[in-house]
């Protein structure tokens, strides 16, 4: 995935930031959001 500079404690928190970044499938890894490009 593509790491973005968004802190998180759970993957659901990454859904919107990833969509806002034009990507999908956010996951929380190492307390940062990681997104999958479209």
Swiss-Prot record:
It comes from the Eukaryota. The keyword Secreted applies. This is Potassium channel toxin alpha-KTx 3.3. GO terms for molecular function: ion channel inhibitor activity; potassium channel regulator activity; toxin activity. Has the structural arrangement of an alpha-helix connected to antiparallel beta-sheets by disulfide bonds (CS-alpha/beta). SUPFAM superfamilies: Scorpion toxin-like. Keywords: Disulfide bond, Ion channel impairing toxin, Neurotoxin, Potassium channel impairing toxin, Secreted, Toxin. It is found in: Secreted. Disulfide bonds join 8-28, 14-33, 18-35. Potent inhibitor of shaker potassium channels as well as the mammalian homologs of shaker. Expressed by the venom gland. Belongs to the short scorpion toxin superfamily. Potassium channel inhibitor family. Alpha-KTx 03 subfamily. Pfam families: Toxin_2. InterPro entries: Scorpion_toxin-like_sf, Scorpion_toxinS_K_inh. Its main location: secreted. GO terms for cellular component: extracellular region. Residues 26-33 are annotated as: Interaction with Ca(2+)-activated K(+) channels.
């Amino acid at each position: 995935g593509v790491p973005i500079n968004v802190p998180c404690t759970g993957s659901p928190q990454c859904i919107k930031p990833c969509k806002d970044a034009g990507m999908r499938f956010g996951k929380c890894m190492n307390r940062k959001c990681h997104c999958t490009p479209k």
